[in-house]
C-alpha cells in the first residue's frame, strides 16, 4: 500500500475581494459581442461537420470502382465544397463585423479591425490529474479535487473574458497558471492523454494537440485579440481615448509578436509566423492611424507648418497600410486571411495617401511667403516634404513664385482625387465594406472636399500645364512600436502548491513513494544534519544513529514529521520541529530522488480534421528531414481550406483520435510550411 502524505495548510490563492479575478463575462448575456462569439462557435461546428463529410466522400471516391457510385460521390462532394465555401464566407463576415466592437459614441471615423477570440472545447483535467497525483506524487488525489476544479473554472472563465484590463489579467493568470501545470503534470517523456482542441480564427477548422503548446499559444492569441477589442472600443473623440487606443494596439502587437517568437511550431495557421507577422503589422498600422487622429483631434489650423506636419503624418499612415496590404497579398497568408481585411488595408492606404496630397496642396495654394516670415524654416520644411522636388523647381523658388506654388498644388489635388476614387472603387467592390456605412461616408466626404478645392482653383489649361506631384515623405512625431507583454504585473499562486516546491516536486523528476522512518529524537545530537531550502535534505548521516538504522539515507528529502507537512519548511523550522519531540519516538516520512529514464522528448502529434498537415507537423517533419537529407525537394504547402481534391493529397482521418505511444511514421516529403469638413478660407480646416 502506497503511503500518503497529509496536506499542508492551504494558503489563500487570492486576497479577499479579488473574487472577480477568476470570472469572465456571463456566457448567457446577449450582448453584441457574445452573439458574435456564439455565431462563431456555431459556424465552427458546421465547418467541422462539413469537413468530415468531405473527408468521407474523398475516401469513398478513392476506393469506389462502380462508375455510378463515383459519379454520385462527385456530385455530393461538389455540394459539400460549396457548403464549405459558404461557411467560410460567413466566418469572414464575422471577422469584418467591426461595428459591434467600436465605441458607443457616435463618431465620424473609419472603423478599426479587432480580432475575434479563438473558440475551444471543454477539457476535463480531473481524472488524468488525480491519477497522476496518486501515481507520481504518491498523494491522495481527493485532497486536490478543489484545486483541479479551480483550474477548470479558470479555463472556463477565460472563454468569455471581459473587454477590459480585468479580462486581460484573467487570461494572463491562466497563461501563467499553465506554466505551473505543465511543470507539475506533463512529463517530457510521455503524453498525459488530454486532448486540447482549438478552432482556427480564420478558417474555423479545429486543431487538437496533447501537449500544452496549443493551449498556451491560443491563450496568448486571445490576449492579443482582447487588446484589439479594447483598442477598438476606446472613445476616439477624446485625447485620452485615442491614447488608450494607441497603447492597446501596441500591446496587442507585442503579445502577437511574443507568440510568434516563443511558439514557433504552433499547429494552427492563424498562429503561424507568417500570419502573426501580418497581424503585428495590422496592429501597428491601426496604432499609427490613432496617432494621426490624435494630431487632428484639436483641429487642423490652416497654417503652413501645421499643414506640413499633418501631411507627413497622413503619409506615414498610408505607408503603414501599403506595407500591410503587400504582406496580406503574399502566400500563404493570402489564402487564409479575410479578403475584406486586405480590402480595408488597400482602401486606407489610398485614403490616407489622398489626405497627404490634399494637405500638401493646401499649404502650397493657400500660403504665400510674406515679408518678415521665417524664410529659412519654410524652405527647410518644404524640402523635407519631398524626396526630390519636381524638375526645374527648388524649395525657395517655389515658395517665392505664386504661379509655381499653385501649379504644384494642383498636381497634388489631381493625385489626391485619383487616390480618393481608387479607395471608393475598392470599397464598392468588396461586399462586406459596402455594408459599413460610416466608412463610405468618410471616404465620400473626403473626396467631395478635395473636389471642391480643385474646382475653386480650376482653369481651362490645367491639363496642359499639369505637374506630376511627387509623393509626400512619411514622417511622424510619434513612431509606434511594439509593447511587450508584462506578465509580472499579474500575481498568480500555484493551485497545486501543496504538492511542494516546484523546483523539486515536478513531473520531470521521479520519486520513490514516501517511506516512514520511525526513530527516537535524542537529546542534543540527532545523528544527522539538514541542508537545502525547501524541502530540506538529510545530510551527514551518522550510520549508527537511530534514524539511519530505521532506514534513512543521506540525500533523502523530508516531507512530513508526525503528520506535519514539511515540504515548505526551512532547515531551522524543521530542526525546531524535531527538537520539540526530544526523547520521543517520531515518524518522519522521506522520499528519494530516482534516476529518470533517459528518453528523447516526444514530438506531439497534432490532429486537424480533414487537413493534410498542420503547421507544426510541417515544421517537425522539416526538422527530421534536415537531419536525414538536406537535398530533398520542397513541396508547396496546401491551403488550410483547399476545397478541391488533389492527387497527391494525404489520407486524412474523419475523426479525432489519440495517438498510439511509440508509433512513428517516416516523412517522405518535405513541406514548407475623421471627420473632414469642407475647407473654408478661415484659419481652421475643421
Swiss-Prot record:
Family of this protein: Belongs to the RHPN family.
Protein name: Rhophilin-2
Residue(s) carrying Phosphothreonine: 655
Stretch list, region Interaction with Rho: 46-66
Chain's role: Binds specifically to GTP-Rho. May function in a Rho pathway to limit stress fiber formation and/or increase the turnover of F-actin structures in the absence of high levels of RhoA activity.
GO biological process, one term: negative regulation of stress fiber assembly
A Pfam family recorded for this sequence: PDZ
Keywords annotated in UniProt: Coiled coil, Cytoplasm, Phosphoprotein
InterPro entries: BRO1_dom, BRO1_sf, HR1_rho-bd, HR1_rpt_sf, PDZ, PDZ_sf, Rhophilin-2_HR1, RHPN1_2
The organism of origin for this protein: Mus musculus
Organism classification: Eukaryota, Metazoa, Chordata, Craniata, Vertebrata
Localization in the cell: Cytoplasm, Perinuclear region
CC annotations in GO: perinuclear region of cytoplasm; plasma membrane
Name of encoding gene: Rhpn2
Keyword match Transport: no
Alphabetical list of Gene3D superfamilies matching this protein: 2.30.42.10, alix/aip1 like domains, HR1 repeat
Amino acid at each position: 500500500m502506497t503511503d500518503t502524505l497529509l496536506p499542508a495548510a492551504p494558503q489563500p490563492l487570492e486576497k479577499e475581494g479579488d473574487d472577480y479575478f477568476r470570472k469572465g463575462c456571463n456566457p448567457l448575456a446577449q450582448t453584441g459581442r457574445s452573439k458574435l462569439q456564439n455565431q462563431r462557435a456555431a459556424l465552427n461546428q458546421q465547418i467541422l461537420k462539413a469537413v468530415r463529410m468531405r473527408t468521407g466522400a474523398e475516401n469513398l471516391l478513392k476506393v469506389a470502382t462502380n462508375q455510378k457510385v463515383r459519379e454520385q460521390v462527385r456530385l455530393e462532394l461538389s455540394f459539400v465544397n460549396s457548403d464549405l465555401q459558404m461557411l467560410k464566407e460567413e466566418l469572414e463576415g464575422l471577422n469584418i463585423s467591426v461595428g459591434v466592437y467600436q465605441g458607443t459614441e457616435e463618431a465620424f471615423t473609419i472603423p478599426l479591425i479587432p480580432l475575434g477570440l479563438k473558440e475551444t472545447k471543454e477539457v476535463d483535467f480531473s481524472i488524468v490529474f488525480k491519477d497522476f497525483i496518486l501515481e507520481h506524487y504518491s498523494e491522495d488525489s481527493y485532497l486536490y479535487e478543489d484545486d483541479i476544479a479551480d483550474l477548470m473554472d479558470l479555463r472556463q472563465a477565460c472563454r468569455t473574458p471581459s473587454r477590459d484590463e480585468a479580462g486581460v489579467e484573467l487570461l494572463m493568470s491562466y497563461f501563467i497558471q499553465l506554466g505551473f501545470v505543465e511543470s507539475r503534470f506533463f512529463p517530457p517523456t510521455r503524453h498525459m492523454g488530454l486532448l486540447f482542441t482549438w478552432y482556427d480564427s480564420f478558417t474555423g477548422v479545429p486543431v487538437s494537440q496533447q501537449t500544452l503548446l496549443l493551449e498556451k499559444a491560443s491563450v496568448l492569441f486571445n490576449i492579443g485579440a482582447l487588446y484589439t477589442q479594447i483598442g477598438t472600443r476606446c472613445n476616439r473623440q477624446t485625447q485620452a481615448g485615442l491614447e488608450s487606443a494607441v497603447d492597446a494596439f501596441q500591446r496587442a502587437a507585442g503579445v502577437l509578436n511574443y507568440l510568434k517568437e516563443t511558439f514557433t511550431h504552433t499547429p494552427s495557421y492563424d498562429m503561424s509566423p507568417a500570419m502573426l507577422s501580418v497581424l503585428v503589422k495590422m496592429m501597428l498600422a491601426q496604432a499609427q492611424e490613432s496617432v494621426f487622429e490624435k494630431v487632428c483631434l484639436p483641429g487642423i489650423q490652416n497654417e503652413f507648418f501645421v499643414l506640413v506636419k499633418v501631411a507627413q503624418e497622413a503619409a506615414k499612415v498610408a505607408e503603414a497600410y501599403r506595407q500591410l496590404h503587400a504582406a496580406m497579398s503574399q502566400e500563404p497568408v493570402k489564402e487564409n486571411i479575410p479578403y475584406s481585411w486586405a480590402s480595408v488595408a488597400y482602401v486606407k492606404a489610398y485614403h490616407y495617401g489622398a489626405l497627404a496630397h490634399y494637405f500638401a496642396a493646401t499649404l502650397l495654394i493657400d500660403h504665400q511667403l510674406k515679408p518678415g516670415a521665417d524664410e529659412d524654416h519654410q524652405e527647410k520644411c518644404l524640402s523635407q516634404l519631398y524626396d526630390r522636388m519636381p524638375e526645374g523647381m527648388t524649395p525657395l523658388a517655389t515658395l517665392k513664385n505664386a504661379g509655381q506654388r499653385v501649379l504644384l498644388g494642383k498636381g497634388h489635388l489631381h493625385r489626391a482625387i485619383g487616390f480618393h476614387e481608387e479607395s471608393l472603387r475598392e470599397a464598392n467592390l468588396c461586399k462586406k465594406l459596402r455594408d459599413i456605412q460610416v466608412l463610405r461616408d468618410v471616404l465620400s466626404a473626403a473626396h467631395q472636399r478635395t473636389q471642391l478645392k480643385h474646382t475653386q482653383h480650376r482653369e481651362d489649361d490645367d491639363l496642359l500645364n499639369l505637374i506630376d506631384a511627387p509623393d509626400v515623405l512619411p514622417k511622424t512625431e510619434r513612431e509606434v512600436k511594439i509593447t511587450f507583454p508584462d506578465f509580472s504585473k499579474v500575481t498568480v499562486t500555484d493551485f497545486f502548491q501543496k504538492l511542494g516546491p516546484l523546483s523539486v516536486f515536478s513531473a520531470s523528476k521521479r520519486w520513490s513513494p514516501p517511506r516512514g522512518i520511525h526513530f527516537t529524537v535524542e537529546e542534543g545530537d540527532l545523528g544527522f544534519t539538514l541542508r537545502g531550502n525547501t524541502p530540506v535534505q538529510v545530510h551527514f548521516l551518522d550510520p549508527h544513529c537511530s534514524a539511519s538504522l530505521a532506514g534513512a539515507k543521506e540525500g533523502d528529502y523530508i516531507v512530513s514529521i508526525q503528520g506535519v507537512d514539511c515540504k515548505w519548511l526551512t532547515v531551522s523550522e524543521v530542526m525546531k520541529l524535531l527538537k520539540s519531540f526530544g526523547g520521543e519516538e517520531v515518524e518522519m516520512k522521506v522520499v528519494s530522488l530516482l534516476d529518470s529514464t533517459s528518453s528523447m522528448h516526444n514530438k506531439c502529434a497534432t490532429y486537424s480534421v480533414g487537413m493534410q498537415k498542420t503547421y507544426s507537423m510541417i515544421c517537425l517533419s522539416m526538422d527530421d528531414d534536415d537531419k536525414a537529407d538536406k537535398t530533398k525537394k520542397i513541396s508547396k504547402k496546401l491551403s488550410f481550406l483547399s476545397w478541391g481534391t488533389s492527387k497527391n493529397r494525404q489520407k486524412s482521418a474523419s475523426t479525432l483520435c489519440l495517438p498510439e505511444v511509440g508509433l512513428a511514421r517516416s516523412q517522405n516529403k518535405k513541406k514548407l510550411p475623421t471627420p473632414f469638413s469642407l475647407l473654408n478660407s478661415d484659419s481652421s480646416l475643421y
